[in-house]
Amino acid sequence: MPTVNSVRRAGNTDEETDPVTMLTAYDAPTASVVDDAGVDMILVGDSVGNAKLGYDTTLPVSVDEIASATGAVARATADAVVVADMPFLSFGADETESVRNAGRMLKEEDADAVKLESGPHTVSLTETLTSLGIPVMAHLGLTPQHVNQLGGYFRQGTDQDSAERMLDLARDHEAAGAFALVLEHVPANVAADITDAIDIPTIGIGAGPDTDGQVLVISDVIGMSERSPPFSKQFGDVNREMAAAVDDYVDAVESGSFPAAEHSHVADDVDDVY
């Protein structure tokens, strides 16, 4: 059974460990399937905004929406480490509010850890949260909450200066107590160098094969996204299966073949009702 500490040890290059697996989930049925499959960590991502709630970006996602999804996932998860994503502006502006919002995910919704889209502004907050017993997963590279500042969903760390700044931030967050680091949309060689330079595990998404683990959005994996990023891979086609099932249902109702006798109950002790 994975724990925050066992995940942290996966970044120790002196130990032979399997790559860390992480997927997103936002509801109990999905979390149950992911957990039963043996995935190490479940991220209740703010990607729920795009994947489930109909938002164009992750920016509108609220603390209440993440909290509700986190509780549902945690109730359905027996083994995986549940990580709650901290949504846009739920942290960083005020330390007291940041601690309260992060603590809520553990205290009320039974998460095991929180994830912060990270930068220079989250180093001291990471130290504060971990000192209070709230495990923190850092996140560098493409940080979708900064899409307006970045001008789009572009690869990060593509020049020497930005790659070295990313490495410095990775080291700073490790020193502040982060137990793992997500690297998103980062050149594979940069991600490999950062992975070699720090002891906590790196979890890649669009960051090549040499990180300590991988994470993807569940809707991309199962084929339920209208658009997937180029670094993702579709392992199923749930959209096609769902569309076929719904078509069959409509046909069955319209043709009168559903519900059939086996789907109905007759009360033998009830006479005709007038």
From Swiss-Prot:
* Protein residues bound to Mg(2+): 46, 85, 117
Task: Look up the EC number in the record and give it.
Answer: 2.1.2.11
Protein residues bound to 3-methyl-2-oxobutanoate: 46-47, 85, 115
* Pfam families cross-referenced by the UniProt entry: Pantoate_transf
What is its pathway? Answer: Cofactor biosynthesis; coenzyme A biosynthesis
The keyword Nucleotide-binding is annotated on this UniProt entry: no
Which reaction(s) does the protein catalyse, per the Swiss-Prot or TrEMBL entry?
3-methyl-2-oxobutanoate + (6R)-5,10-methylene-5,6,7,8-tetrahydrofolate + H2O = 2-dehydropantoate + (6S)-5,6,7,8-tetrahydrofolate
InterPro entries for this protein: Pantoate_hydroxy_MeTrfase, Pyrv/PenolPyrv_kinase-like_dom, Pyrv_kinase-like_dom_sf
GO cellular component terms given for this protein: cytoplasm
Sorted alphabetically, the Gene Ontology BP terms of this entry are: coenzyme A biosynthetic process; pantothenate biosynthetic process
Q: What is its main location?
A: cytoplasm
Q: Which UniProt keywords apply?
A: Coenzyme A biosynthesis, Cytoplasm, Magnesium, Metal-binding, Transferase
SUPFAM superfamilies per the UniProt record, alphabetical: Phosphoenolpyruvate/pyruvate domain
| Cofactor binding note of this UniProt entry | Binds 1 Mg(2+) ion per subunit.
Q: Please list the cofactors this protein needs.
A: Mg(2+)
* Catalytic residue positions: 184 (proton acceptor)
**UniProt GO MF annotations:** 3-methyl-2-oxobutanoate hydroxymethyltransferase activity; magnesium ion binding
Localization per record: Cytoplasm
- Please describe the quaternary structure of this protein: Homodecamer; pentamer of dimers.
Quote the function comment for this protein.
Catalyzes the reversible reaction in which hydroxymethyl group from 5,10-methylenetetrahydrofolate is transferred onto alpha-ketoisovalerate to form ketopantoate.
Q: Do you know which PANTHER family this protein is assigned to?
A: 3-METHYL-2-OXOBUTANOATE HYDROXYMETHYLTRANSFERASE
Sequence similarity: Belongs to the PanB family.
Q: What is the name listed in the Swiss-Prot or TrEMBL entry for this protein?
A: 3-methyl-2-oxobutanoate hydroxymethyltransferase
Q: Which gene encodes it?
A: panB
